[in-house]
Amino acid sequence: MPRPIVRSAASVWGARRHPGPWMRWFSVGLALLIFAGWAGEYVAEVIVGTWSVQYSLPLQLTDAVSAVSIAALLTRRQLLVELAYFWSYTATLQATLTPDLGQNFPSVFYFTYFTYHVGAIVAASFLVFGCRQYPRPGAVWRAFWISLAWAALAGIGDLITGGNYMYLRARPVHNSLLSVMGPWPWYIPSGIALALVLLLVVDGLTRAFGGVAAVTAEADGRSARPRLPWVM
């Protein structure tokens, strides 16, 4: 999909070539846009009567990505930026390319879905490549273990509600990477292994293209965040 690439590239180019106070307002605006799409989907489900505890609780990984992306944009906490980056460039990108979406254009769910999915990818690109908050050493493993913890939370939600959060009880209806990983439950360990591989690939590509984290605060006694004009 070209639009996420164009928007991500534009935000990165602007942040690197013309840093300034506009970056703060861009972060706030993008956070509000992601929230509008994310929350708007739940509001729409309530209005049309499709909301249910089996399918509508915020237990999918994309829910975590949305929340983390918003928090990362507003606070620029390094751990949040790293999670937003790794999750957006793996899970969210895959969900954008192969959406498990029952509604097509011009449904409101089509717009809300792509608003917060594409928004998360743009946010990750802006923060990591535009603001140069590159992942620290070990970040990929932190993202992996936190992902497993979220999956465990989703599994508890599945047991309580009878739902299928994070597709732990059944594969998506529409084609995705899980479709080629065998039947339940074998696609679950395969999916975990693939997730780790993708995280390592993203981390490796980031470093190969010059994405090296700044010296840590513990090492030099100063904040590890890049000094930008809008950071107080």
Question: What do these predicted ranges mean?
Answer:
Residues 97-147:
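A contiguous pocket-lining binding segment that forms or flanks enzyme active sites
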